C-alpha cells in the first residue's frame, strides 16, 4: 500500500491543501523532465536520481558534503524526525520511500550513488565559513590571551608561539595536508583551564577533541576526522623517550590513508587538524639530542590570570572569536608563518 508521503511532506512546506497541491504540481513538472523508457515509465538511472535530488521540492539543496568531517549531511528541516545534521540510515529510508512513491524508482544502489554525486557537488566547509565571516574589531588579543586566561608571561616568545600555532591551524584548514608538525604545550597549573583554553580556541566544541588515547589504535584516524584542535593530555603525561618519539612521528604525518566502514576504496585524507599538549609538570619532555623543536612549551601561572576561562563562557568565546579574526587579517601574506617554518629552532 502506498503511503501518503505528500501529507508527510506538508510538515516542511505547510499542511495546507494549497501547499500540498503545489508540491504535487512541482513533482509532476519534474517527472516530465526525467528520462522515460519506451513504455512510458521513468527510467531507473543515476542521472534521473540526480535530477530528482536536485529538483524535488523537499530534497533540493539539502543534501551536502561537509568537507571538514568528510560526511554527507542534511541541512534544513525535513518531514521526518532528525537529531543532528549527519546523514543517517533513517534519512535514506525516507528518501527511498519518496523516490518510490513519487517517481517509481526503487534501486537503492542508484539512489545512493546519486546522493554521493549531489552531496559532492554541493559541498561546504564549516570551519572555512566560520573563519571567513569573522570581523576583527582591531583590538589586539593574541599577545595577551595566555596571560588573560592562564597567567602566562606577556612576552614576545609566548605571543609568537601562540601566533605560530594559530597560523598553522588556519593553514591546515585552507590547505589540508600542509606541513605543520608542531604542538603547542601548556604546562603547569592543575585545574587552571588549559584544556578549556584549547576547547574554546577550536571555535566550536565539536571541532575539539581530547579523545586521542593511543596513537597505534586502528581507529585513530577516524578520531581525527572532523576535529580542528586535538589535545594530547594523557600521552604527554608519560615523559619517556619512546613515547615522545612516537608523538613526534605522528605529528610529522601530513595525511592519513584509510578506508571508511562500508567504503570500497581507501582514500588519502590530508590532515586538517593541529595537535596541542597539556601537562601539569614543567619538565614533561625527556632530554633528546635530536632536539624537541616540535614541542612549543608555554608555562602558565593561574594565580596571575585576570579571569578564569569558565567564569563567563560567553565572554571567553567572544574573546577567542576575535583572536581568530585578528589572525585572519595576516593570513593572506602569511610571511611570519613561512619564515618560522623555514628556520625552526631546536
Where are these regions (language model features)?
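Short alpha-helix boundary/capping motifs
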Residues: 1, 194, 275-276
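N-terminal nucleic-acid engagement/recognition segments and initiation subdomains in replication
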Residues: 1-140, 156-160
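P-loop NTPase catalytic core of nucleic-acid-dependent motor ATPases
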Residues: 118-225, 229
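Arginine residue identity/basic-tract feature
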Residues: 3, 12, 27, 31-33, ...
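Short amphipathic alpha-helical segments and helix-helix/interface helices
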Residues: 198, 247-248
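Feature primarily recognizes SF3-like P-loop helicase cores of small DNA viruses
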Residues: 100-103, 109-125, 179, 206-210, ...
Amino acid at each position: 500500500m502506498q503511503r501518503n508521503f505528500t501529507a508527510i511532506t506538508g510538515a516542511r512546506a505547510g499542511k495546507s491543501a494549497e501547499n500540498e497541491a503545489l508540491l504535487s504540481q512541482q513533482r509532476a513538472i519534474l517527472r516530465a523532465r526525467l528520462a522515460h523508457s519506451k513504455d512510458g515509465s521513468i527510467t531507473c538511472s543515476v542521472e534521473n536520481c540526480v535530477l530528482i535530488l536536485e529538483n524535488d521540492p523537499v530534497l533540493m539543496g539539502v543534501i551536502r558534503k561537509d568537507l571538514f568531517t568528510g560526511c554527507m549531511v542534511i541541512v534544513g528541516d525535513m518531514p521526518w524526525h532528525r537529531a543532528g545534521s549527519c546523514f543517517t540510515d533513517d534519512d535514506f529510508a525516507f528518501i527511498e520511500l519518496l523516490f518510490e512513491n513519487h517517481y517509481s524508482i526503487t534501486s537503492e544502489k542508484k539512489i545512493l550513488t546519486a546522493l554521493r554525486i549531489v552531496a559532492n557537488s554541493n559541498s561546504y566547509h564549516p570551519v572555512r565559513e566560520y573563519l571567513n565571516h569573522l570581523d576583527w574589531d582591531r583590538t589586539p588579543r593574541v599577545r595577551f590571551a595566555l596571560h588573560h586566561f592562564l597567567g602566562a608571561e606577556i612576552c614576545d616568545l609566548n605571543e609568537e608561539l601562540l601566533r605560530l600555532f594559530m597560523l598553522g591551524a588556519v593553514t591546515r584548514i585552507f590547505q589540508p595536508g600542509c606541513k605543520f608538525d608542531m604542538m603547542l604545550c601548556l604546562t603547569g597549573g592543575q585545574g587552571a583551564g588549559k584544556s578549556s583554553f584549547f576547547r574554546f580556541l577550536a571555535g566550536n566544541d565539536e571541532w575539539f577533541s581530547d579523545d586521542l588515547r593511543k596513537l597505534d589504535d586502528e581507529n585513530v584516524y577516524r578520531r581525527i576526522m572532523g576535529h580542528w584542535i586535538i589535545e594530547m593530555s594523557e600521552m604527554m603525561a608519560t615523559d619517556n623517550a619512546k613515547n615522545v618519539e612516537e608523538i613526534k612521528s605522528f605529528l610529522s604525518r601530513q595525511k592519513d590513508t584509510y578506508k571508511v566502514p562500508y567504503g570500497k576504496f581507501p582514500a588519502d585524507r590530508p590532515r586538517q587538524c593541529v595537535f596541542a599538549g597539556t601537562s601539569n609538570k614543567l619538565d614533561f619532555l625527556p632530554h633528546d639530542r635530536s632536539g624537541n623543536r616540535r614541542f612549543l612549551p608555554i608555562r602558565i601561572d593561574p594565580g596571575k590570570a585576570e579571569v578564569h576561562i569558565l567564569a563567563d563562557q560567553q565572554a571567553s568565546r567572544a574573546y577567542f572569536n576575535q583572536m581568530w579574526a585578528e589572525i585572519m587579517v595576516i593570513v593572506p601574506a602569511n610571511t611570519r608563518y613561512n619564515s618560522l617554518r623555514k628556520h625552526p629552532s631546536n
